[in-house]
Swiss-Prot record:
Its cofactor is [4Fe-4S] cluster. This is Phosphomethylpyrimidine synthase. InterPro entries: ThiC (IPR037509), ThiC-associated_dom (IPR025747), ThiC/Bza_core_dom (IPR038521), ThiC/BzaA/B (IPR002817). Pathway: Cofactor biosynthesis; thiamine diphosphate biosynthesis. It comes from Pseudomonas putida (strain ATCC 47054 / DSM 6125 / CFBP 8728 / NCIMB 11950 / KT2440).
Length: 626
């Protein structure tokens, strides 16, 4: 530890990022209660102004939106990152009676870190003893689902996905939505707990929720549910502190990150992860091989199954919800990458490829896969089967190495399912638009509809600094085709470690992609927010336009750059067209004129009817004597 690190006592000094705890404008946190009082599902309600009288003068109902920000945006909750978030799930877990509280950490490395006095100032102070399944028990959500059990987590996500659709339907808000094309997905009109159970039992969806992460607000990943996004954080050997990573977490979930992966490769990985999990209301994923490699000083050849196994247990007992495991990088596939333009670009994939070649043995993650499953089901950690041979350039898309690994991931999925372990599949990468659907179709075929989770894909390689856009295009497409979760890409992709601003930009870009996919699939209620914003735009309700958007702050700032006065917030124009050429304003004038013409037409028509009646009463004579 450096002198500066020794001087910092995080258990005394750590503070929440103040930007992350500000409520959104005109929004309030609401909770929908389930069948028991401790099932309280958070949503964000956006209040709207009334329609101005010159537009008809009507009230506008509040709009509910999916909320990933956890307690951070609830003004009634006092946030102290030194103590972690409120417990959501412990009562549910204890009631099932199939877990036990351990006397202490069971991983060698975890015990070693705990006994290192020098780390005391960096360590999260309020660590619980971990839970584990009782001997012979399986505590995965898939196992419960296959036993016909609807867990509290399943009911929670059903309420969360449903977003009070029944009320919206009764109000007629679902009538104004285009029909979608879902490419074979089976999206019901209402998400019920039983439907959630069926999807998890079938393997088409997962609820990543480790029994040692009781702070998590359950969410679901699957093609028949809302498209989700993941944001990456994590330190590197070149920088970032524990506080900075926790700030990135809280910042990311504020803007809509459904899950977060901690990809730390620098110092204090164990301690950083503990702070992140204890303060995260969303599932946390990791790539355990990264930390295992740090334990052998970066020498891939020195990795062993025993070391990796201890790392899995260490992270599972901290509460990691899903592991990226690169078990599909087989020895026979490595030569297939030799003629690629960019070779193997996955860090985990390259680590395992190097190990295989150095020992001329099969990937130990593959040969020990059943043993990995035994660990996963003891803590309910979900698999995210890594695509270690994903293409790193569009020239390498859809090649033999990529699809060979995908077929192996399909085999491993079936093994995981035999253990009742939840599983999703990671995908590319760099893929031109015309080849994206082939990726989705092949994944559905090989992996029997297990959820697909892709990095983009990037649709062109010519835009360093703008790869959030090149990948957002591919993400929207593959989300429409059936991808369940999209891993964000920031503007710093290929260039450097993202900061807070980059994290926000990446998340907003991917929220756009995911929402566009939901619209295209015809997900019930997906268009409600669009319709509300469009109506506000037409009625020049500027504040409502800002607040209904994914990023109210940026929308308001852009508007105020040229029209900063408060009076501009009620003006019937913006600086793009000015008062004379605003198409919305002109349309309103056309409507008013048409209404007047229509009124004149009605008067003329009424007069003509009266004259016709008089003509008949007078005998229908064309001429009368004077």
């Amino acid at each position: 530890m450096t002198k500066q690190e020794k001087a910092i006592n995080l258990s005394e000094s750590a503070q929440v990022d103040q930007q992350s705890v500000q409520p959104f404008p005109r929004s309030r946190k609401v909770y929908v209660e389930g069948s028991r009082p401790d099932i309280r599902v958070p949503m964000r309600e956006i209040s709207l102004d009334d329609t101005p009288t010159d537009f008809g003068g009507e009230s506008n109902a509040p709009v509910l939106v999916y909320d990933t920000s956890g307690p951070y945006t609830d003004p009634d909750v006092i946030i102290d990152v030194r103590k972690g978030l409120p417990d959501v799930r412990s009562a549910w877990i204890e009631a099932r009676g199939d877990t036990e509280r351990l006397e202490g950490l069971s991983s060698d490395f975890g015990q070693q870190r705990l006994n290192d006095a020098e780390l005391a100032k960096l360590r999260f102070a309020h660590v619980r003893n971990p839970r584990r399944a009782k001997a012979g028990a399986n505590v995965s959500q898939m196992h419960y689902a296959r036993q016909g059990i609807i867990t509290a987590e399943m009911e929670y996500v059903a309420i969360r996905e449903n977003m009070k659709l029944q009320e919206a339907r009764a109000a007629g808000l679902l009538n104004e939505q285009h029909a979608g094309h879902s490419f074979g997905a089976n999206i019901p009109k209402e998400i019920t707990p039983e439907f959630v159970r069926q999807e998890i039992a079938r393997g088409r969806a997962i609820i990543p929720a480790n029994i040692n992460h009781p702070e998590v607000e359950p969410m679901i990943i699957g093609r028949n549910f809302l498209v989700k996004i993941n944001g990456n954080i994590g330190n590197s050997a070149l920088g970032s502190s524990i506080e900075e990573e926790v700030a990135k977490l809280t910042w990311g979930i504020r803007w809509g990150s459904d899950t977060v992966m901690d990809l730390s490769t620098g110092k204090h990985i164990h301690e950083t992860r503990e702070w992140i999990i204890r303060n995260s209301p969303v599932p946390i994923g990791t790539v355990p091989i990264y930390q295992a490699l740090e334990k052998v000083n970066g020498v891939a050849e020195d990795l062993t199954w025993e070391l990796f196994r201890d790392t899995l247990i260490e992270q599972a007992e901290q509460g990691v919800d899903y592991f990226t495991i690169h078990a599909g990088v087989l020895l026979r596939y490595v030569p297939l990458t030799a003629k690629r333009v960019t070779g193997i670009v996955s860090r985990g994939g390259s680590i395992m490829a190097k190990w295989c070649l150095a020992h001329h043995k099969e990937n130990f993650l593959y040969t020990h896969f059943d043993e990995i499953c035994e660990i996963m089901k003891a803590y309910d950690v979900s698999f995210s089967l890594g695509d270690g041979l994903r293409p790193g350039s569009i020239a390498d898309a859809n090649d033999a190495a990529q699809f060979g690994e995908l077929e192996t991931l399909g085999e491993l999925t079936k093994i995981a399912w035999k253990h009742d372990v939840q599983c999703m599949i990671e995908g590319p990468g760099h893929v031109p638009m015309q080849l994206i659907k082939e990726n989705m179709d092949k994944q559905l075929e090989c992996c029997d509809e297990a959820p697909f989770y892709t990095l983009g894909p990037l649709t062109t390689d010519i835009a360093p600094g703008y790869d959030h856009i090149t990948s957002g295009i591919g993400a929207a497409m593959i989300g429409w085709f059936g991808c369940a979760m999209l891993c964000y890409v920031t503007p710093k992709e290929h260039l450097g470690l993202p900061n807070k601003d980059d994290v926000k930009t990446g998340i907003i870009t991917y929220k756009i992609a995911a929402h566009a996919a939901d619209l295209a699939k015809g997900h019930p209620g997906a268009q409600i927010r669009d319709n509300a914003l469009s109506k506000a735009r037409f009625e020049f309700r500027w504040e409502d336009q800002f607040n209904l958007g994914l990023d109210p702050d940026t929308a308001r700032a852009f508007h105020d750059e040229t029209l900063p006065k408060e009076s501009a917030k009620v003006a019937h124009f913006c600086s793009m067209c000015g008062p004379k050429f605003c198409s919305m304003k002109i349309t309103q004038e056309v409507r008013e004129y048409a209404a007047k013409i229509e009124a004149v037409d009605v008067t003329v028509e009424q007069g003509m009817r009266e004259q016709a009646e008089r003509f008949r009463q007078e005998g229908s004579q064309l001429y009368h004597k004077v």
